[in-house]
Amino acid sequence: MIYYGTGSEKTTLTEEDLRNGLYTALDKIGRKKKVLVVPPDITRIHSRAGEITKLAYDYYKKNLTDILPALGTHVPMTDDETAKMFPGIPLNLFRVHNWRNEVVTLGIIGEDFISEITEGKIKYPWPAQVNRLIKNGGHDLVLSVGQVVPHEVTGMANYTKNILVGTGGSEGINKSHYIGAVYGMERLLGKADNPVRQLLNFAASKYLNDIPVVYVLTVIGRDESGKLVTRGLFIGDTSEVFMLASDLSLKVNFTVLEKPIRKAVVYLDPDEFKSTWLGNKSIYRTRMAMADNGELIVIAPGLKEFGEDREID
């Protein structure tokens, strides 16, 4: 069901618009006694998820008991980073996703299905994994909040990825990323339907049905002055809400050029990009526009590590 949806290439949603849209949806969903919010981490600080999480906290008050940022294998946020992205929310509500030790396997997707969606290139089973708080926390509502934007692994970010990858375990994360790599980034970037998304949506249909997840999806673009603005807000619990957000993202987050780029300079926001693991997005998101033998210059003042984890690093 779609509880709320608005947006276009010219829409500019204010914080008041976000509040009205979110509260319209939450009113339709009905009263809840124990709510979990799953937003992104600070690597998605521009998603408006911080503000939306605060609005949800204001709406549910003491009934919002837990906030679990979808870290994936990213390094946990510091208290300062949490306060910056989620101002006005008590720090004691935040939980840290431990992708090594705090995941449960909901079920296994068989190797035949993986082989089918990957054109026979990969044949291994895939575990549908989530943080145990999602499965065993006893929440009567899980709000999955985040931005739909072109993504180098899943074609379009968010929706079922936020739960099954963002709160998943190492095996599920690594194997899903490898499927995207084998299929080919150029074939899936910006496409809502692709093998990785088929896997995540199929797993969700089999193993998330007993978990009351509602997705709150934003689409962010730039106005004529280059300022980031919110172009869309879509809230619901079916794939249709994701497709609406993806269609809008395709219009506002892609720039089609008349000819390839000979030389490009990419600046990485130091608050968002601190590792080469994330900084490599400067390559992923330009490579399809770069000319053969072109030059890409990456300015990364916040860079301090390779991996998003001390052991991986």
State where each predicted segment sits:
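Short glycine-rich or small-residue beta-strand-to-loop segments that form or flank ligand, phosphate
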Residues: 34-45, 68-72, 144, 265-267
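Histidine-anchored nucleotide/phosphate-binding helix
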Residues: 44-63, 279-290, 297
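Acidic, Ser/Thr-rich peripheral helices and adjacent loops at domain boundaries
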Residues: 81-101, 307-313
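N-terminal amphipathic/basic leader segments beginning at the initiator methionine
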Residues: 1-17
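C-terminal catalytic subdomain
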Residues: 274-313
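Conserved, well-structured core segments that form the ligand-binding/active-site neighborhood
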Residues: 96, 100-260, 288
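Short internal beta-strands
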Residues: 63-74, 295-301
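Glycine-rich phosphate/diphosphate-binding loops that line cofactor/substrate pockets in enzymes
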Residues: 20-36, 61, 135-138, 209, ...
